[in-house]
Swiss-Prot record:
The gene is CLC-D. SUPFAM superfamilies: CBS-domain pair, Clc chloride channel. It comes from Arabidopsis thaliana. The keyword Transmembrane helix applies. The keyword Protease does not apply. It comes from the Eukaryota. Voltage-gated chloride channel. This is Chloride channel protein CLC-d. The chain crosses the membrane at residues 78-98, 119-139, 170-190, 195-215, 237-257, 267-287, 320-340, 361-381, 451-471, 474-494, 508-528, 529-549, 731-751.
Length: 792
């Protein structure tokens, strides 16, 4: 019992430690989300990843048999299957739409410029403008939470932050159709980050049975009522999004593990890997189906996979220095990109976007016009180059036939045997432009002047575009930027080491990895993704080298891109390491400014309503008194649970005396206390109480958490931070140092051996643990090994 741990009573000024210890707000875990998309009251709350083991929960668990446990496990795996299928189909739809819009746009433009370049430019600009306008209109008018990549918001959700609107059905729709418009409209952004958000939305909607607002819900799948279960599903959705975007199932698993999740369990690894595998099957099936030509312009190049298996087979020791230089350049440009996007986004939010949705739409349209003018106009200023003699041997046609786009684009050239190298990059889809930069056997296809021009202009466009009111990812733009300066370095190496068999495309690949490492600061997952999308395992050591260097250089200047954006949006992430100044602080110092409101075990309904209406605390310590008058803390009750009790009224009683929870018939199931994702949940204004109701009482003992986590007041704040984050807590009690110890648990008290070979260890175990295990072992027979592996 918690009361045995708190013999000396409590001090109301240092009882709770919440997610933001430096907050001056009296609300311990209600944090205002500044300058963000608001839905409802505009704030964010912490999620309850800790299982509230109250009497209602324990009674429900006691009545669950093997059949229910098997059903529970089966539904988890079935939902993992549905998440993989749903995310894969969403990715196919997005890519099919983007490729066809881009194909029709370029085909029409190339057809018109055969007669008039000005008319072709007008058509090209108008098509891009319509697509971008549709994307911005959908976001501003229908789904404001779908703007941006969505990864900082999902990372915050998996870190324990409930951000309104992030996982709604309309956010999913806005993300899908908004991505089609923004990417198809030629903006300097990608669809990979939005696909991660899309997978998370699909997972969340499946976990709650659909959307109640749009009457697209069902009761039978509403099994996962706890935030802990929903967190696992959203993790599967994030991995599925990466797997669908890059056709990299292993990379998707590692991305979820390295970048977005804060808590990871071995059982979750099974389902995440299974979900990513399902995505890979769905995507490859769709790709094979589209090879027959029924998908229009969408074919083999629809998903961003760039096969460089025919590139450079080996490397020389002399090449390590220029490769290290690529890593340094990636770290510098990545850190600069993060800082510039921070300034641009901050200015945009504080000045421009405050003027309303119309300004957001106009801004996106202006950027679309500028991007179209640059991508069409700059190649006109570049002189065409004659086709190289080695092109026929490589199997690549030079120039491309009219109406085609790819390598060696004939754009504003005087003769048919010429190509425009700047148009080959600019006047193309991003996927095909990257494929051109990565391509082997295309020595000297691009001039240094064209690559420098493209690098400067596209880098600027990527900075300016990031933060507009459209869905935007930074994976592909980052690959574009990195592959450009990587190919530049490769050109220098080719000219410096004339006799070596060096491919410029290999250096372009290393440059892409270096920029992503310098901007996003991912290592393991990004390394695997780059290997999977390029189908070249031989380059793995080189990719690892440039990633390590670029990350180290970038970390010397600022945080990663997603951390910077999360901080800008006011998402209170708990990072893996506490801040340095916490080493000099203790737990008591972190919560001295807080005003903690305690509730008695049996409380008047009027007092509960008054307390809930006068503050926004989400957790309340519940106290009781011994016969000698000593104050004891008996647990923690959540605000959401109190609201459910007030609304139902079935637990009201006339007597102010406590009842025996074990002998009481609990009239609530544990799932009734869960807050749905797609709605704001209950608030005190939604509850109507009569004057007779207000005079009645509630015994809180059956509904409180009798065993919350507790730390002494003089524990170091770094230790408190690690405990709070690793356990996924929402509240943590800070109490005076207890005066009495009732026991000491060691490793041997928690070990239970099931075979006779380890009897020596078993004899050392706690008698109570072994006795309890012997009572339950007969009930957990043959089904247990399977359930232990699958349940979680």
């Amino acid at each position: 019992m918690l009361s045995n741990h708190l013999q000396n009573g409590i001090e109301s000024d240092n009882l709770l430690w919440s997610r933001v210890p430096e907050s001056d707000d009296t609300s311990t875990d209600d944090i205002t989300l500044l300058n963000s998309h608001r839905d409802g009251d505009g704030g964010v709350n912490s999620l309850d990843y800790e299982v509230i083991e109250n009497y209602a929960y324990r009674e429900e668990q006691a009545h669950r048999g093997k059949l229910y446990v098997g059903y529970y496990v089966a539904v988890k795996w079935f939902f993992s299957l549905l998440i993989g299928i749903g995310t894969g189909l969403a990715a196919v739809f997005i890519n099919l739409s983007v490729e066809n819009f881009a194909g029709w746009k370029f085909a029409l433009t190339f057809a018109i410029i055969q007669k008039s370049y000005f008319a072709g430019f007008i058509v090209y600009l108008l098509i891009n403008l319509v697509l971008v306008f549709s994307s911005a209109y959908i976001i501003t008018q229908f789904a404001p939470a779908a703007a941006g990549s969505g990864i900082p918001e999902i990372k915050g959700y998996l870190n324990g932050i409930d951000i309104p609107g992030t996982l709604l059905f309309r956010t999913l729709i806005g993300k899908i159709f908004g991505s089609i418009g923004s990417v198809g409209g030629g903006l300097a952004l990608g669809k990979e980050g939005p696909l991660v958000h899309t997978g998370a939305c699909i997972a969340s909607l499946l976990g709650q049975g659909g959307s109640t607002k749009y009457h697209l819900n069902s009761r039978w799948p509403q099994l996962f009522k706890s935030d802990r279960d929903r967190r696992d599903l959203v993790t599967c959705g994030c991995a599925a999004g990466v797997a669908a975007a890059f056709r990299a199932p292993v990379g998707g698993v590692l991305f979820a593990l390295e970048e977005v999740t804060s808590w990871w369990r071995s059982q979750l690894m099974w389902r995440v890997f299974f979900t990513s595998a399902i995505v890979a099957v769905v995507v490859r099936t769709a790709m094979g189906w589209c090879k027959s030509g029924i998908c229009g312009h969408f074919g083999g190049g629809g998903f961003i996979i760039w096969d460089v298996s025919d590139g450079q087979d080996d490397y020389y020791f002399k090449e390590l220095l220029p490769m290290a230089v690529i890593g340094v350049i990636g770290g510098l440009l990545g850190a600069l990109f993060n800082q510039l996007t921070l300034y641009m986004t901050s200015w945009r939010r504080n000045s421009l976007h405050k003027k309303g949705n119309r300004v957001k739409i106009i801004e996106a349209c202006i950027i679309s016009c500028i991007t179209s003018a640059i991508s069409f106009g700059l190649p006109l200023l570049r002189k065409c180059s004659p086709c190289p003699e080695s092109v026929p041997d490589s199997g690549i046609e030079c120039p491309r036939p009219p109406g085609m786009y790819g390598n060696y684009v004939n754009f504003f050239c005087k003769t048919d045997n010429e190509y425009n190298d700047l148009a080959t990059i600019f006047f193309n889809t991003q996927d095909d432009a990257i494929r051109n930069l990565f391509s082997a056997k295309t020595m000297r296809e691009f001039s240094a002047q064209s690559l420098l021009t493209f690098l400067a202009m596209f880098y600027t466009l990527a900075v300016v575009t990031f933060g507009t009111a459209v869905p935007a990812g930074q994976f592909v733009p980052g690959i574009m930027i990195g592959s450009t300066y990587g190919r530049l370095v490769g050109m220098f190496v080719v000219r410096f080491y004339k006799k070596l068999n060096i491919e410029e495309g290999t250096y372009a690949l290393l440059g892409a990895a270096s920029f992503l490492g310098g901007s996003m600061r991912m290592t393991v997952s990004l390394c695997v993704i780059m290997v999977e999308i390029t189908n070249n395992l031989k380059l793995l050591p080189l990719i690892m080298l440039v990633l390590l260097i670029s990350k180290a250089v970038g970390d010397a200047f600022n945080e990663g891109l997603y951390e910077v954006q999360a901080r800008l949006k006011g998402i209170p992430l708990l990072e893996s390491r506490p801040k340095y100044h916490m080493r000099q602080m203790i737990a008591k110092e972190a919560c001295q400014s807080q005003k903690v409101i305690s509730l008695p075990r049996v409380i008047r309904v009027a007092d509960v309503a008054s307390i809930l209406g006068s503050n926004k605390h989400n957790g309340f310590p519940v106290i009781d008194h011994t016969r000698s008058g000593e104050t004891l803390v008996i647990g923690l009750v959540l605000r959401s649970h109190l609201l459910v009790l007030l609304q139902s009224k079935v637990d009201f009683q006339h007597s102010p005396l406590p009842c025996d929870p074990s002998a009481r018939n609990i009239r609530h199931s544990f799932s009734e206390f869960a807050k749905p994702v797609s709605s704001k949940g209950l608030c005190i204004e939604d509850i109507h109480l009569t004057s007779d109701d207000l005079e009645m009482y509630i015994d809180l003992a059956p509904f409180l958490n009798p065993s919350p986590y507790v730390v002494p007041e003089d524990m170091s704040l770094t230790k408190v931070y690690n405990l709070f984050r690793q356990l996924g807590l929402r509240h943590l009690f800070v109490v005076p140092r207890p005066s009495r110890v009732i026991g000491l648990i060691t490793r041997k008290d928690l070990l239970i051996e099931e075979n006779g070979e380890s009897s020596a260890v078993e004899l050392q175990q706690s008698t109570s643990v072994r006795g309890r295990y012997s009572e339950t072992a007969t009930r957990m027979d043959a089904a247990r090994p399977l359930l232990d592996d699958l349940l979680g």
